[in-house]
């Protein structure tokens, strides 16, 4: 009987090892696929960076769920690069490791960058002038204020409010 128990335990161990390896392989494949997709998006689209927070993401046109799954999204109808109020949004969730998780750590005076898709990858440097928490229905943050600014919007971690970071254009190079 002891020999039979050993065979069962050994067989169970082999089966568990096989399934464990398969599960890990699936997750590794998904992570690698997502990383490769993200690299392609960074190469083909406008890029947004906040070096102090280790944020570097592509900016896709529109804020639909498909765009926001992998990137920040530009609110259609708001400014263009270096002109007006260029507004972008991205997800925040410490549980799911989303792109704007650390947005609440931004400080006045920090720099944010947008990189164009042109041949020279023109850099737009914005200096943070404001961080605030607003009601989800506060759409006035999307308004044109007559200056050249970047507005970054994301949920608070609990999703009840919106974090808003405003930076004023300092340089185009």
Region annotations inferred by a language model:
Residues 1-3:
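Juxtamembrane low-complexity tails/linkers enriched in Ser/Thr-Pro and polybasic
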Residues 5-173:
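Solvent-exposed, non-transmembrane regions of membrane-associated and secreted proteins
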């Amino acid at each position: 009987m002891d020999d039979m128990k050993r065979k069962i335990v050994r067989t169970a161990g082999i089966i568990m090892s096989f399934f464990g390896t398969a599960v890990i392989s699936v997750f590794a494949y998904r992570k690698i696929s997502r990383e490769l997709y993200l690299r392609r998006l960074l190469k083909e689209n406008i890029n947004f960076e906040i070096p102090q927070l280790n944020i570097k993401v592509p900016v896709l046109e529109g804020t639909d769920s498909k765009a926001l799954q992998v990137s920040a999204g530009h609110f259609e109808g708001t400014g263009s690069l270096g002109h007006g109020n260029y507004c972008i949004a991205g997800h925040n969730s410490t549980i799911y490791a989303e792109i704007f998780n650390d947005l609440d750590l931004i400080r006045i005076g920090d720099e944010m960058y947008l990189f164009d898709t042109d041949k020279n990858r023109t850099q737009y440097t914005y200096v943070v002038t404001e961080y605030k928490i607003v009601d989800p229905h506060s759409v006035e943050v999307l308004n044109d204020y007559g200056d050249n600014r970047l507005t970054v919007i994301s949920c608070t971690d609990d999703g009840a409010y919106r974090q808003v970071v405003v930076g004023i254009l300092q340089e185009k190079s």
